[in-house]
A protein has these predicted regions:
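Conserved alpha/beta catalytic core and glycan-binding cleft of carbohydrate-active enzymes
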Residues: 101-103, 254-270, 315, 319-320, ...
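Active-site groove signature of glycoside hydrolases
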Residues: 251, 313-339, 446-450
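Conserved, mostly hydrophobic/aromatic
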Residues: 33, 134, 189, 199, ...
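Structural preference for beta-strand elements that scaffold enzyme active sites
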Residues: 129-134, 196, 240-244, 325-329, ...
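Glycan-association/targeting regions that enable binding to alpha-glucans and other polysaccharides
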Residues: 1-132
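Substrate-binding/active-site clefts of carbohydrate-active enzymes
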Residues: 135-195, 202-323, 348, 352-358, ...
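Surface beta-strand/loop "capping" patches
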Residues: 15-16, 21-28, 529-553
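Aromatic- and carboxylate-lined catalytic core of secreted/periplasmic carbohydrate-active enzymes
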Residues: 431, 500-539
Length: 560
């Protein structure tokens, strides 16, 4: 199927189409729609919904350039998330709606309206940034790593040992990477073009992934302790880079000090932090039934105070002195605060954002949501999403080797992969990003792979890797380099993807490193790639094309 999209009217939330990307409530905003010559628009109106009630604003023809008419209207931003869409009447008596999903003859759903978000401006440094994801145990070891005493749970491995295929032992396999090793390799990360270092959890735990925290008070001594994090962040900041932490607000480990204080102890202050299934507090709700990961109960005011609310909370502590993290990626954000009839997720995420803003308004908040994330990402808290539905899945399904089986992890997170053509990939992408306000879309992670899924290269057809990396770097969002992608590492599932980096073979990876560096450098030199709009031009089986547009210029991208 070949789809030509260049002849459709277009609008998005970028500066070429919206006069103020970060308005305050009560401010007036002008919006423009681009209508190709010959489409035949005779009247254009903007439908807004102040306080939920539809209201129409007349647009006027506002200049033209060769082959294009511009229509413009102004309205007042009445609500924190202000929805709008366009109605375009034609000379032949027909009318079409234009919303974030595209052009429609029939009335579309309100959920896919364009949205302007008022207040709580995301940090400017996140626009156009490139992220590098670090899994500390497998990234690099500093000179002092080997001198640390290992806990009982750890099963030591040599750096060149393969990941244990017996998944009963994988989480305990300990390679000894630490934060000092990350600091020593900042040259490498920056050389790839990355300016955000995203660290998976650094708190003490009983696994190498550390998503089963046993405390949030200190950095794991196995990673070098608090001092190592302070040193890493200072070194990164000295280079103009940012460091993002990883915090799990859905659960902790069953060895966590709060859980240990409550387990089997009815009446303990921490009892209200968890969901108990018996009066003795010996059985409890956990993440997906995994007993080592008890689930937090966010009905507890004391849990909120200790963990997410105010200057003394865990959320605040690591953003302030002396640590100065630049933000959080929240693990399992989609499940946080949700259990049966409880849905405290909106409250929890807004409290986290408010606390972060009070400590340092120049911090970034990303939430993990593995599926359709739009409903939770209206711009009220999360600046962007770590999701697989809008970028990862369409790119995989288009550029995978036809008929190749889905690896473990990917199927769990985003469903079984399929064989799609380019037009399918574009259609799916447009479907899933339609619900994001523009400022959320530009800060949502474009990940080809992560620590939770197979490596893209495992499934990619010949020649597809440069195309996929190019899409990650040029589509709206935060491109993500998962450690090891630049080495061409493989991985059949999430665990197998966490292979220690082969620093001794750095020279053999230079071509791929250069690929990342060249593509990332475009984001420094082309303002269209930071927050510029995206207008689709073409989609067919083997090629897609789009224009990234900004007041400074237009960049046309063709992927084939």
């Amino acid at each position: 199927v070949t789809v030509s999209l260049s002849s459709d009217p277009h609008h998005d939330g970028s500066a070429l189409y919206v006069s103020n990307l970060d308005p305050e409530l009560g401010e007036s905003v002008r919006v423009r729609v681009r209508v190709p010559d010959g489409w035949g628009a005779t009247r254009v109106r903007v439908r807004v919904r102040p306080d939920g009630e539809p209201f129409y604003v007349e647009a006027t023809r506002h200049g033209s350039v060769p082959h294009v008419e511009w229509w413009e209207a102004a309205f007042t931003v009445e609500n924190p998330q202000h929805p709008y869409r366009f109605r375009l009447d034609r000379g032949d008596g027909t009318a079409h709606w234009l919303n974030a999903r595209g052009l429609h003859r029939l009335d579309p759903r309100d959920a896919d309206d364009f949205r302007i978000v008022a207040g709580d401006v995301p940090p400017a440094w996140s626009a156009g940034a490139v992220m590098y994801q670090v899994f500390p145990d497998r990234f690099a070891r500093s000179a002092t790593a080997s001198s640390r005493e290992l806990p009982e749970w750890a099963e030591p491995a040599a750096w060149t040992d393969p990941v244990d295929p017996d998944r009963r032992h994988t989480a305990a396999q300990f390679y000894g990477g630490d934060l000092g090793g990350v600091e020593e390799r900042l040259d490498h990360i920056q050389g790839l073009g990355a300016d955000i270092v995203y660290l998976t959890p650094v708190f003490p735990a009983r696994s190498n992934h550390r998503y089963d925290a046993l405390s949030f008070e200190h950095v794991d001594p196995l990673l070098g302790g608090d001092g190592a994090l302070i040193s890493l962040v200072e070194a990164a900041h000295g280079r103009g880079m940012r460091v993002l932490g990883d915090l799990t607000t859905n659960h902790c480990g069953d060895a966590h000090e709060w859980f240990q204080a409550a387990y089997g102890t009815p009446g303990a202050p921490e009892s209200e932090f968890f969901y108990w299934l018996d009066a003795e507090q010996l059985t409890y709700v956990s993440w997906l039934g995994v007993p080592s990961l008890p689930k937090f109960n966010w009905n507890s005011a004391e849990l909120r105070r200790r963990f997410i609310e105010g200057p003394d909370s865990v959320v605040a502590k690591w953003l302030g002195a002396p640590f100065h993290l630049d933000g959080w990626r929240i693990d399992v954000a989609n499940m946080t605060g949700r259990y049966r009839t409880d849905d405290l997720n909106p409250e929890v995420r807004r409290i986290i954002r408010r606390t972060m803003t009070e400590v340092n308004p120049d911090t970034l908040l990303l939430g993990e949501f593995t599926g359709d994330a739009a409903a939770d990402f209206a711009g009220d808290a999360w600046h962007g999403a770590m999701t697989y539905a809008n970028f990862t899945r369409p790119v995989w399904n288009w550029l995978r080797t036809p008929g190749s089986p889905a690896g473990g992890g990917l199927s769990m997170i985003v469903g079984e992969t399929q064989d799609w053509d380019g037009s399918d990939a574009v259609a799916s992408h447009r479907e899933f990003v339609a619900g994001f306000p523009w400022r959320v879309r530009t800060r949502t992670m474009n990940a080809l792979d992560t620590h939770d899924i197979p490596r893209f290269v495992n499934d990619a057809r010949d020649g597809a890797v440069p195309v996929a990396v190019g899409l990650a770097m040029t589509m709206p969002g935060l491109p993500v380099i998962w450690q090891g992608d630049e080495f061409g590492l493989t991985g059949s599932d999430g665990e197998d993807s966490r292979t220690p980096l082969p620093w001794d073979s750095l020279s053999s990876a230079r071509d791929r490193i250069a690929l990342y560096s060249r593509l990332a450098s475009l984001r420094d030199t082309r303002p269209e790639l930071a927050e510029g709009g995206l207008r689709w031009l073409h989609a067919s089986a083997e090629a897609i094309a789009f224009a990234r547009e900004a007041p400074e210029g237009v960049l046309v991208v063709v992927a084939a």
